[in-house]
């Protein structure tokens, strides 16, 4: 399935966004981000601590930016930023 902004908005309206997070496409992208970061929490690593990353966070919230749900990066004022970051549960 291709996850379009329209489809994501429909899931949000139906209170079924969990379907996106259970999709094969999201799980593959999530696993890619975790692997690229060696399963380390980026937030903790930036503070000198090593913690196991267990989830991937959207910097640009899916409910606010459904068009970026599957985007690793986003642009703001001409600069590229990471949209998906590996995090622990702490």
State what each model feature region is.
Residues 1-28, 45-52:
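A boundary/linker detector
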Residues 1-3, 36-40, 66-68:
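Short amphipathic alpha-helical surface micro-motifs
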Residues 19-22, 58, 75, 82:
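Compositionally biased, intrinsically disordered low-complexity regions enriched in proline and serine
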Residues 20-21, 33-36, 63-67:
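A short linear-motif detector with a strong N-terminal bias
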Residues 26-32, 72-77:
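Short, intrinsically disordered, charge-biased short linear motifs at domain edges
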Residues 27-60, 88-90:
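Short cysteine-rich loop/turn motifs with clustered Cys
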Residues 41, 65-90:
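Short beta-strand-alpha-helix junction that forms the catalytic/metal-binding core
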